[in-house]
Regions:
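Ribonuclease/tRNase effector modules and their secretory precursors
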Residues: 1-107
Length: 107
């Protein structure tokens, strides 16, 4: 089971996008930037540090959330220049979906 805290990113200045992370997520997983951003505007999300991929230069986080149209997404993110940078976005795995649904089963 994942260990996580409800981390707040409310003081950040939006998102950082470039050709690399925009096209990669759309081509590999059919997830566009607007869906990624929607996850952060929906209160049904879990954010936890990804200790496996964090290094001494940059913390990585995993986000399990839901888009406006109800798509359950898993994101890998980091913070650069006080902005959220999405590294990877895809549909939640079965294990991630079970964790997400158990957290929000009464909501």
């Amino acid at each position: 089971m994942y260990q996580y805290n409800k981390i707040s990113f409310s003081s950040l200045d939006g998102f950082e996008w470039d050709k690399g992370n925009v096209n990669k997520n759309r081509l590999k997983h059919n997830v566009d930037t607007s869906e990624c951003e929607e996850v952060f505007f929906n209160n049904l999300r879990i954010i936890f540090e990804d200790t496996k991929h964090t290094n001494r230069l940059e913390k990585r986080y995993r986000v399990l959330g839901i888009s406006t149209n109800g798509r359950k997404l898993a994101l890998a993110i980091t913070i650069r220049n006080n902005k959220i940078r999405v590294i990877m976005a895809r549909d939640q795995s079965r294990k991630e979906r079970a964790l997400f649904e158990s957290e929000f089963k009464d909501k």
